[in-house]
């Protein structure tokens, strides 16, 4: 006896989350073009939430597919590659043109560098699925890089700290270039996943749950600034662990 066909509504569900994330990234670009930078940054974080949900929904409903994987990757390129680059450019990097025409080109080149590195990072991730240790990301994940970029914009775009994008243009340039290079680096970043296989493969370690509790408390106190602190600490964690491992390495005997 043949099993009943799976409902198309269930099959479409994970792709609807992906579409919602894609819409959020597209909206971020539109909002930035209209000078609504806080809304643009928030939209990218909404896209990150949708990106975290679509894969889990697909696994829970047993509706994972190659189409969904490819669609998710393309949506990520818009939401975590193009959108953060354009938001940062409109908010701050475009102001470099007031220094000189050369610096103006440096500004949009940095934005392009970020978008290109995000594309390379996503392509590398797709080719390494099932090959690398799930406990680690090789290079800063594109959602984390986008979070670093957008938390920086969000923290200062509301003018509560007394700085605007034009004043912070060189800091923004550094943040953009560093985030781009970290994505294509070989530095390992903790993925917050365990190393188990089988049904327990996606379970989150207890330490990650403890960290999440602290993070939630910080987010309640000051959302924008807390996201920036978290983004900076996570971006630094990979290089610091790399330096620690090199320092601890015992030199070989001649």
Question: What is each stretch, according to the model?
Answer:
Residues 1-9, 33-39, 64, 68, ...:
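Short juxtamembrane and helix-loop transition motifs at transmembrane-helix boundaries
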Residues 13-18, 60-122:
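Multi-pass membrane catalytic core of lipid/isoprenoid biosynthesis enzymes
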Residues 27-42, 84-109, 152-171, 220-224:
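Helix-coil boundary and interhelical linker segments in multi-pass alpha-helical membrane proteins
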Residues 109-148:
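Hydrophobic, well-structured mid-protein blocks that either form specific transmembrane helices
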Residues 1-2, 134-254:
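C-terminal membrane-associated helical module and adjoining short loops/tails
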Residues 26-29, 46, 50, 84, ...:
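Alpha-helical transmembrane segments of polytopic integral membrane proteins
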Residues 1-52, 241, 245-247, 251-254:
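Topogenic membrane-insertion module of multi-pass membrane proteins
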Residues 23, 49, 53, 57, ...:
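Active-site His/Glu-centered metal-binding helix of metallohydrolases
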């Amino acid at each position: 006896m043949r099993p009943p066909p799976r409902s198309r509504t269930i099959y479409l569900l994970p792709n609807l989350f992906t579409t919602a994330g894609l819409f959020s990234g597209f909206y971020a670009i539109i909002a930035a073009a209209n000078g609504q930078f806080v809304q643009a940054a928030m939209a990218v974080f909404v896209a990150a939430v949708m990106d975290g949900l679509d894969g889990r929904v697909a696994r829970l409903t047993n509706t994972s597919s190659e189409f969904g994987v490819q669609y998710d990757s393309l949506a990520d390129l818009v939401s975590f590659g193009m959108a953060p680059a354009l938001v940062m450019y409109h908010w701050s990097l475009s102001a470099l043109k007031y220094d000189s025409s050369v610096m103006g080109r440096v500004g949009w080149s940095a934005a392009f560098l970020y978008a290109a590195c995000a594309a390379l990072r996503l392509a590398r991730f797709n080719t390494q699925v099932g090959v690398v240790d799930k406990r680690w990301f090789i290079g800063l994940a594109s959602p984390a890089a986008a979070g670093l970029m957008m938390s920086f914009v969000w923290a200062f775009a509301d003018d509560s700290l007394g700085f605007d994008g034009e004043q912070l243009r060189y800091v923004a340039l550094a943040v953009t270039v560093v985030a781009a290079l970290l994505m294509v680096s070989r530095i390992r970043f903790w993925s917050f996943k365990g190393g188990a296989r089988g049904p327990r493969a996606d379970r989150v370690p207890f330490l990650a749950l403890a960290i999440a509790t602290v993070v939630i408390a910080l987010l309640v106190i000051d959302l924008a600034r807390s996201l920036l602190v978290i983004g900076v600490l996570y971006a630094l964690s990979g290089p610091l662990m790399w330096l620690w491992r090199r320092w601890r390495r015992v030199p070989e005997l001649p």
